[in-house]
A protein has these predicted regions:
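Terminal-proximal interaction/regulatory segments of ATP-powered molecular machines
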Residues: 266-371
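Arginine residue identity/basic-tract feature
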Residues: 8, 50-52, 57, 88, ...
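Phenylalanine-focused residue identity feature
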Residues: 16, 40, 62, 71, ...
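AAA+ P-loop NTPase catalytic core and its hallmark functional loops
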Residues: 1-172
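Generic serine detector
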Residues: 14-15, 33, 41, 76, ...
Length: 371
């Protein structure tokens, strides 16, 4: 996802990014103030009675199947017309109608507003397309580098499948937070210095927290507080980031597998509504992985029992969305088939549990209200 480094002049923003360049990772630097909109949107050319957009030369620096970094330096010197042209480059990753290679990362740098001379404030739409990070050099680090030299930066790698699973894990937790704080979905750009909350920046946050977790920066480790705070603030703004991280650290949730295997009986009265929502979303994720497994039948028993307890506790509305999501898969059909294969007695028990849930009068009333 695109990153914007904010720092005073001379602190090494450009040097660091350009220092990442090697044969497999070309870095192309474009200084915003010396380019016009067509350098980012393409130049319209009439050809055979039709207008096409000629691709700027800098795009050729990147191969179709290779990695690279597009570095947009001095971004705050870009006039509004150039900023508008950059919107598509930064978020849609297209120069005119020409897509950037998938391996190209987009990084920008800018001076803080109080240090800008003759610059332009970034428009809210452009700001919202970046993760914003403050960049500075502590004195002790600079002094150390004078005698020992600068360490070369490295780009960490994260396995895509592992990230997809971890992303889902944090998406359910963020969904739980937004159930408690629905107004946090959006924030006023004018009330935040750089990043501000929007559905897009919440997507960024989930992806970054998932990546951080895989790289060892875990939510409940106090040593990682500053790293996670900087990343969340860069997406959402400081106030929302503080609330989110506090929520994530204080979640009281049992391991979903322990619940599904019957090793843990969930104390419903100790869980608030957001925690119960997150728990059921996590249980769903595990059950959906077992649709073709022999574990589906024994694991569904505790799930149905817990859902029944939540209904009796008057919390149908809390688990309605996760329950509906699971029911929209082949879960019920496969569960009934496995129950039938297990014999008449087991089939009767499973059928009774399912019918009890989905014929519940309170659930029907809740659905009617939603309709």
């Amino acid at each position: 996802m695109p990153v914007l480094l904010w720092g005073r002049p001379g602190v090494g923003k450009s040097s660091f990014i350009e220092g990442l360049a090697n044969e497999q990772l070309p870095v192309t630097t474009l200084i915003a103030s010396i380019h016009d909109p067509t350098d980012f949107s393409g130049l319209p050319v009439l050809e055979d009675g039709r207008v096409r957009y000629a691709v700027p030369r800098w795009v050729d620096d990147f191969t179709d199947d290779g990695d690279g970094i597009l570095f947009l330096d001095e971004l705050s010197t870009a006039p509004p017309s150039v900023q508008s042209a950059l919107l598509r480059v930064v978020f849609e990753r297209k120069v005119g109608f020409h897509p950037l290679p998938s391996g190209v990362r987009i990084v920008a740098a800018a001076n803080p507003p109080d240090l800008m001379v003759g610059g332009w404030e970034l428009s809210p739409p452009l700001r919202n397309r970046f993760v914003h990070l403050d960049w500075d050099i502590p004195t002790d680090l600079y002094v150390h580098s004078l005698t020992s030299g600068w360490e070369t930066g490295e780009l960490p790698e994260v396995e895509a499948k592992a990230h997809a699973e971890k992303l889902r894990f944090f998406q359910t937790r963020i969904a739980g937070f937004l159930r408690v704080k629905p107004d946090a979905l959006h924030a006023n750009p004018e009330e935040n210095k750089y990043g501000f909350a929007s559905p897009r920046s919440w997507d960024f946050t989930a992806a970054l927290v998932a990546t951080s977790d895989l790289l060892g920066y875990r939510i409940n480790d106090e040593a990682n507080n500053q790293v996670l705070f900087e990343l969340a603030t860069g997406c959402l703004g400081e106030a929302t980031a503080i609330m989110l991280l506090e929520y994530l650290r204080n979640l009281r949730l049992p391991d979903p597998v322990d619940v599904l295997t019957g090793q843990v009986i969930v104390p419903l009265e100790e869980l608030d509504d957001s925690e119960l929502f997150v728990l059921f979303a996590g249980l769903n994720d595990h059950l959906k992985k077992e649709l073709d497994s022999d574990r589906l039948l024994p694991w569904s028993d505790p799930y149905l029992a817990l859902a029944g307890r939540a209904f009796k506790d008057g919390r149908r509305d809390v688990i309605f969305v996760p329950l509906k999501e699971l029911a929209s898969t082949t879960w019920l059909v496969r569960l009934m088939a496995k129950g039938q294969a297990a014999g008449p007695e087991k089939f009767a028990i499973i059928s009774a549990s399912i019918n009890s849930l989905f014929s519940d009068e309170g659930l029907r009333e809740f659905i009617e209200v939603l309709s």
